[in-house]
């Protein structure tokens, strides 16, 4: 959806709602019964993050204007483009081709780049990448190929990375 974190959406079937009614300690966050009671009254059980709701409204307009199939195809094309470039430059994509995400490309940091230093360079060009998590923190880096990212953004990132490799 290309939104900041902090908003959850859920679809709950009649069967799941019936089951939720019989759960004695539903907690607060996932109490579908409480949420449904408030939904019927067009209210919420807690203060909602209104800027995110407005942002969701804008994003849904963008998504539907582009069309889901076109959006998914764009994400896939960007992921393939970046992955192909990375592999051609000796940096393997971490997942096997059949299992690769179309929304984020995770690449082995085979060049041994200091991702913090790389990001300092990239921010001068208005972009940044993310390193991996946990034990993969310095061994991988991630490039977003989703949301409002466009192929031109990927091409600009590739050009910047090629410039960085020459430094």
What residues fall within each predicted segment?
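Solvent-exposed alpha-helices and their adjacent loops that cap or buttress functional pockets
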Residues: 1-4, 97-98, 134-136
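A short linear hydrophobic-aromatic micro-motif
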Residues: 90-94, 128-132
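PLP-dependent enzyme catalytic core of the Aspartate aminotransferase-like
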Residues: 135, 139-167
């Amino acid at each position: 959806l290309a939104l900041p974190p902090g908003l959850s959406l859920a679809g709950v079937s009649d069967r799941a709602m019936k089951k939720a009614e019989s759960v004695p300690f539903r907690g607060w966050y996932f109490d579908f019964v409480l949420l449904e009671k408030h939904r019927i009254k067009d209210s919420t059980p807690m203060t909602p993050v209104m800027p995110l709701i407005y942002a969701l409204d804008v994003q849904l307009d963008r998504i539907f204007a582009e069309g889901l199939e076109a959006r998914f195809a764009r994400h896939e094309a960007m992921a393939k483009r970046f992955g192909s470039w990375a592999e051609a430059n000796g940096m393997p994509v971490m997942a096997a081709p059949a299992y690769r995400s179309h929304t984020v490309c995770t690449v082995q940091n085979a060049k041994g780049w200091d991702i913090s230093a790389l990001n300092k360079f990239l921010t001068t060009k208005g972009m940044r990448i993310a390193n991996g998590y946990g034990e993969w923190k310095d061994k991988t880096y991630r490039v977003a190929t989703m949301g409002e990212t466009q192929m031109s953004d990927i091409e600009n990132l590739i050009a910047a990375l090629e410039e960085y490799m020459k430094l």
